[in-house]
Amino acid sequence: MKISILGAGSFGTAIAIALSAHGISVNLWGRDHRNITHINTYRKNLKYLPTYHLPDNIYATSNIDEVLSDNNTCIILTVPTQQLRTICTQIQHKQHMCKNTPMLICSKGIEITSLKFPSEIAEEILQYNPIFILSGPSFAKEIAEHLPCSIVLAGDNKELGESLIEKISNDVLKIIYHQDIIGVQIGAALKNIIAIACGIIAGKNLGNNAVATVITKGMNEIKTLYIAKNHSIDLHTLIGPSCLGDLILTCTTEHSRNMAFGLEIGKGRNINTLIDHNLKLVEGTSTVKPLISLAKKLNVELPICISIYNLLHENISLDKAISNILS
C-alpha cells in the first residue's frame, strides 16, 4: 500500500513516520529541495522535527508528479489553508494521474479571499476526487514519538471513509469516522483563536479559573458558528475529538503554538513583533480575519474571537481585550 503526503512540515512528517512504522510506503512531497535531499540522505527532516528518524519506506521528493499517481490509496494534504487552493489547482492540472483518489485534508482555518473552509476549497477544484477532512487533537512531536492520538476522518462517503480508516488507522493514529465535515472544520478553525486568548490569560497570571472560563465560552462560540453555518448541530462532533478534544489540547499547553503566542502577548511582548516572527506558524493569526468576516456574513457574535481580532489588528489595549474576553 502506498500513501502520498503533500506538505513536508512537522505534521506531514509526523504522519509519514506513523504510517511508515506500520508497513505503509509513503511519498513525502515538499517545496524545499535542499530539505528534501537531507531527508533522503540522512533520514531526518532537519528543518522540521530534526531529532526523529524517518524509516526507509519514506521517500521524499520536491517533484509533485512523483507523488500523484493512481497507485495511491489516498493523498494526504498537510499544507496551510492559505496555500491549499494553489496545491489543489496543481493537482487538478494533473487530474489524469490521480482521478478518483481520495484526498484527506489536514489544513485548518478559513481561506482569506473566499471565506471557505478547506473542504469547500478542495470540492470546488477537485471535482473528481472524494474529499475528506482529517482532524483532531494531535501534536506532531507526539505522533513522531509513536504516542497515541484520537482523530476524526470526516466526509460524505461513509463506506469509503470507513474503508480508509481500516487501512490507515493504527495504534498511534486512532481514527473514527464522522459525516459532519463542516462541523469538524469549525472546531479546528476556532480553537486556535481561543487558544491565543487562553495564552493571554495565562501570561497575565489571571489563574486557571479564568482559563477554564475562556475555554467554556470558546466552546459556546464554536457552537454558535456551527449552528449558523450548518443550520444544525451534531452533538457527537461538538463533544468529540475534533471540537472539544482539540480545543482542550490547544488551550492548555505551551506546546500549542497558538497558546504560546498568546502567552507572550500576556507577558507584555510587542504584538507586531510577535506576528512578524510567527505569522506562518500560528494558525490563529491568519484565521481570525476571515473568521470575523464570516461571522458578520452569518450575523453571529463571537466575543472572544472579535476581541483577539481587535487586539491583533485594531490596536485596542491588552487590558481592554482581556476585559472583553472575560466579560
Swiss-Prot record:
Biological process (GO), any one: glycerol-3-phosphate biosynthetic process
Active site: 191
Top EC class of this enzyme: oxidoreductase
Keywords: Cytoplasm, Lipid biosynthesis, Lipid metabolism, NAD, NADP, Nucleotide-binding, Oxidoreductase, Phospholipid biosynthesis, Phospholipid metabolism
A GO term for molecular function: glycerol-3-phosphate dehydrogenase [NAD(P)+] activity
Pathway: Membrane lipid metabolism; glycerophospholipid metabolism
A GO cellular-component term linked to this record: cytosol
Cell compartment(s), UniProt: Cytoplasm
Cross-referenced InterPro entries: 6-PGluconate_DH-like_C_sf, 6PGD_dom2, G3P_DH_NAD-dep, G3P_DH_NAD-dep_C, G3P_DH_NAD-dep_N, NAD(P)-bd_dom_sf
Similarity-based family: Belongs to the NAD-dependent glycerol-3-phosphate dehydrogenase family.
HAMAP family, alphabetized: NAD_Glyc3P_dehydrog
Entry protein name: Glycerol-3-phosphate dehydrogenase [NAD(P)+]
Organism whose genome encodes this protein: Ehrlichia ruminantium (strain Gardel)
Organism taxonomic ancestry: Bacteria, Pseudomonadati, Pseudomonadota, Alphaproteobacteria, Rickettsiales
Gene behind the chain: gpsA
